[in-house]
Amino acid sequence: MKLGLTGIETSGPSDEQAVLVLGGKHVGELIAQRLQADGYSVGLVDETHDSEAVPTNAGDPSDVRILAEAGAADASVVVVATPRDSRNLLIAQLVRAHFDVTDVFVLVNSPDRSDLVADVGHEPVCATTALSEAVVADLEPTVSELDTA
């Protein structure tokens, strides 16, 4: 029997690939659900959302005590996904300062802030860029039909 980040038996890639998602309400939950569906050991920390699909610790993801209770020390990957860039950077810095986490991915809403996040050692994921690329990709077949009409 192999136990993951949340103490729940997992058949995922490995305990070394435990992922902790911090904040993000529905976005954070969906990230956690998709990772869990791919077989990763996943936990979620969020102030207002209690997921039935993913083990969730209710609490402030900027509280080091809550992060410790959620298993941040056992995570090899943390995804910080609150709606505010400044808060995401603060939480990412707390994770780096207090826990030995290999990779910290930070959701960035403003593309202008991606370089700042990268400069301090985190992996930025720009929500604006990802969303706009997804919308354009979905619209492309419809728009190309208009060009041929």
Locate the predicted segments by residue.
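Cytosolic regulatory regions of ion transport systems
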Residues: 1-149
